[in-house]
Amino acid sequence: MKQKKNRFGSGKRITDQSSVDGDLIAPGNSSMDKRRNSSSSRSSSTQESKELTESLASVHTSDMHQSNIHERIDGDDNPFLDQDDESFKSTRANTSATKLTDVVNPNAEYKDNDSDNDEEILTATAPDTSITEGIVSTEADGGNDVVTASVEDKEGTVTDTAVGLDNANNTVDQKVKESIIPDIKLINDRVQILEANKVSEGQGRAYVAYTIKWGDQSVRRRYSDFESLRSVLMKLFPTSLLPPIPEKQTLKNYSKSIAGSKSNYLLPSEGTGSVDLVLSVINGTVTNNDEKLIRHRIRMLTSFLNKLLQDEEILKTPIIYDFLDPNNINWNDFINSSATFSMLPKSVLQCNPLDPTNTTRIHACLPVPSTSHILPSKEKVSDTKTIERKDGFDIIEQEHKQYESLLKSGFYKHNTQITKSLYGMQHDMKDLSDTFAHFASAQACEAELAEQLTYMSNAYDDAASNLEALVGLLYYNINEPLGESVRMAGSAKELIKYRKLKGVQLEILINSLESKRQQLHKLELQRGVQPRNGNTASGASGNDESSVKKPQASKSQSSSYGGKFLNRFNKIAAMVKETINYQEQDPQTTMANLIKEIEQLNESEQVARHDLEDISKIIKEDRLTKFSEEREKELNEILRNYSKYLKDYAKKNLELWKEIKTRQEQL
């Protein structure tokens, strides 16, 4: 038998059952003796069960036999705990694992590290069993495996905890996504504007509130809310091609600018594309002109929201869901209370084009050019214009201008005139129908002639009805989509204009940087001339004159994007500035200020150049390519519908007049 030092401090050898029962306990402990005497009666009552346990333990190895003996010692002869066997074992397992945690056996750790993955998985899934087995082998073989069991249990616990944390993180992420992005079914649903209610604000003011239905929820918004939404999107996504919204027009002057003040078109029973105006109801008393304006806005605003819900980049932010959330009753209050929207720069040209919410200090200090800076001039071509020629943006700009002109001044304009002409022809046919009916009633004696006149009256009346249906289809399903395409081309033009203004911004920085460098060079020359004698002063003055001319030339070059008036004004301003700045100033202080300004301009120039490259790449390779593909599909659909409507009208009209001819031949 091995020398076993028990937890009471004695080091006697365990030889037989008597030594186990008597000699293991430390001498001189009266309480322990009392406990042993009190436990003798209990041990005698359970003698049969102990003998059965010993017989079963003898079948196993000697190590297992020793462990069983020691378990019986702990269960029967422990003087400190008055508990049953099972509760004592669990308490013993916890205390042993806690006490021996600091004792580490390198060989045991090495074996544990080289163990199979299956054993680790079993340990992680059943930590209680591993602890019990570890304690049994520890009491028998020297106490090394109990550390292994506790370590395995800790590793299994850590693994389970890590899995639990991962599951918790996944659950939190899923909840965050669900709080930001609604159900997938809602994303696939299309927006519909079901009602348009005329609401009075008091003092003779009124506005139209549009009831938007999306999935199972509905919210009411007015036109100014859509306008505010688009302005925020332009700041958040400056490089995206945003769909247009209808122009800001009053209820009085809209009809004059679209189709005349007296036109009233029949609403078609079939809708095309994503907008079906039949589903929209206008509540309240409105005139014909107001009805056209409201239906025009319903179509444009519905298409606006549906296109936003199809944009993957915009869907990454919750702004569209916030707009459609019925809990946000007042949209302006929601925008004003948001810290993200309030921190955005006022000008898009001072935003970070890739992430406007992460605008740096350098972006906020960039100059903001006006539209007058991009006016054409006959002066020298600047560096940014050569960049545009290399990138091909000058050709792209001309092509989109031509495309917008063909749509607006060509297809859309002439089709609107045709619609108005057909609308006038419709009223002429109704007048002819009334005239023939009047003649038929006047021919009382001529029954045959009266019957023919009645047929003609009915024919013109039916033709007027068919033409009225055609005019309604052309107006709502052809002219309105064409007008939307024209405004979409205007959005592409705005995107190209944004890129061009960023180029002008870079040009301003380059010219300002060159001007500051020349001013610094001039001051350095003046500072080097001052301590010298008068013989070199004349040469230095000549150099000064040449150096003075360079900033003026650069200033004239910097104003190459302006007109003649701006050039002269800039020259006068530069002369006044030089007389003020360079009169009785400390050259050293001025040079220090110029050096700081040059460093800031260098940083701004690098940022502006990098932004221009990113914007050019995104617009040219992604935005305009998608724009061309989408416009091609829309125009194909419009032309197919156009030919279908004209074909159906011609077929109905032909059948009508064939029937009139047949009746006349029968007479």
UniProtKB/Swiss-Prot annotation:
Primary localisation category: membrane
Feature: compositional bias, Acidic residues: 76-85
Tell me a Gene Ontology molecular-function term this record carries: phosphatidylinositol-3-phosphate binding
Q: Which domain of life is it from?
A: Eukaryota
Q: Which cysteines are joined by disulfide bonds?
A: none
> Which keywords are on file for this protein?
Autophagy, Coiled coil, Endosome, Lipid-binding, Membrane, Protein transport, Transport
Under the cellular component aspect of Gene Ontology, which terms does the record hold?
Answer: cytoplasmic side of endosome membrane; cytosol; phagophore assembly site membrane
Coiled-coil region(s): 588-652
Question: What sequence ranges are listed for the domain PX?
Answer: 185-331
Report residues binding a 1,2-diacyl-sn-glycero-3-phospho-(1D-myo-inositol-3-phosphate): 222, 224, 248, 297
Please report which protein family the annotation says this sequence is part of.
Belongs to the sorting nexin family.
Q: What is this protein called?
A: Autophagy-related protein 20
Ranked from the top, the taxonomy reads: Eukaryota, Fungi, Dikarya, Ascomycota, Saccharomycotina
Q: Which gene encodes it?
A: ATG20
